[in-house]
Amino acid sequence: MRTNKKDLLLATALSIVESDGLAALTYDSLSAASGISKSGLIYHFPTRHQLLVELNTSAARTWTRELEAAAGGPASKVSLRQRMHALLEVESHSATRADLLLSIDANLNEEIRAIWDQALAPWTDPHNPHAVVVQLIADGLWVYDHINARPLTQQQRQAAVKTAHIFLNKLSTTPSKPSPTSDFTNNIK
């Protein structure tokens, strides 16, 4: 399959964010790294904001593909247990710097936050306390090494995943959608 120029530019942009941070992603840096003129970049991304929207959209698609591969299908076709297991599997490894920076920045912009909410919401159930605990463990594993002086050892990661499986085993194996009427506080046991 032939990769189009826009996809190559997004991959280059992601590598800039990974190595130098989000603030370093400019038309100048992307032009220098890709060999494409600034006017060529503006053709694909008329504004830096549009570049960030496209970069987050691409990252969210990648994330969704990883979740679907781990779950064995799209969120709408698998059980809550499979969805949460996939989330745990995908997030049990430390985030890349680029993913973490995009995630943090997304919360500062409603349009970009909506991209991630649309991608991730089908995979979680904020009304199921066991699913919330699994998500908290998965999210914690994903960011831990970036916010603590000492990274987790492989044994510590495995212990956290094992603990999450206790809560995973309490989730239904029947394909289901989140129930907005569930009472979070009364369901944790």
List each language-model region with its residue ranges.
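Helix-turn-helix
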Residues: 8, 16, 22-50
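Structural detector for internal amphipathic alpha-helices that build alpha-solenoid repeat scaffolds
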Residues: 103-105
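Solvent-exposed, amphipathic alpha-helical segments
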Residues: 12-19, 66-69, 137-144
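Generic hydrophobic, amphipathic alpha-helix propensity
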Residues: 5-16, 30, 55-59, 63
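Hydrophobic alpha-helical connector segments
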Residues: 54, 61-97
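A structural signal for repeat-array scaffolds
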Residues: 98-101, 146
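Hydrophobic/aromatic-rich alpha-helical bundle segments in the mid-to-C-terminal region
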Residues: 109-189
